[in-house]
Amino acid sequence: FLSFLIFHTVFSQDYYVYVAAESDDQVSVLKFDGKEIIETDRISVGIMPTENEGPHGITIDPSGKYWYLTLAHGSPNGSVVKYSTENNEPLSKVELGLFPATIQISKKTGLLYVVYFNLHGLMKTSTVSVVDPEYMVEITKIKTGIMPHGSRLSPDGNFHYSVAMMSGELFEIDA
């Protein structure tokens, strides 16, 4: 009997996943109840309806109240947009540079780390932006390698990692 209760408790929880469709300027919210997956919401994102702005990276803050989305292609620059998880409405945004791609939020500091995967022009050294999500302002840019992609924080939130695709370098940033 106890096994059934544990099984039921574990598998009766609903899980939500946010999925960005980069070529369609939409984000789908998927709900998994332990048995099936259904789309509960489809959110149109971007600023200009006639331009593909490319939603790319998504992260949810530790409180679960907000989610953040990078619009990688932008006009002329990309941005990070802050949304409410309650109604999936945009709350604020910060314009960044060319092609902000992957994004993570530190559970320790609450800061956002945004990696630039610049596909425009010559391959050159890129950056990771540190953004204050409360005020949606860029605090600093940290120089990395050429075309960094991927963004991960250590489980304790102390370090941010990204890899520069063109140089094969791994960058560790004190978060």
Residues covered by each model-derived region:
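Predominantly soluble domains enriched in secretory-pathway, periplasmic, or organellar proteins
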Residues: 8, 12-175
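Bacterial N-terminal signal peptides
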Residues: 1-8
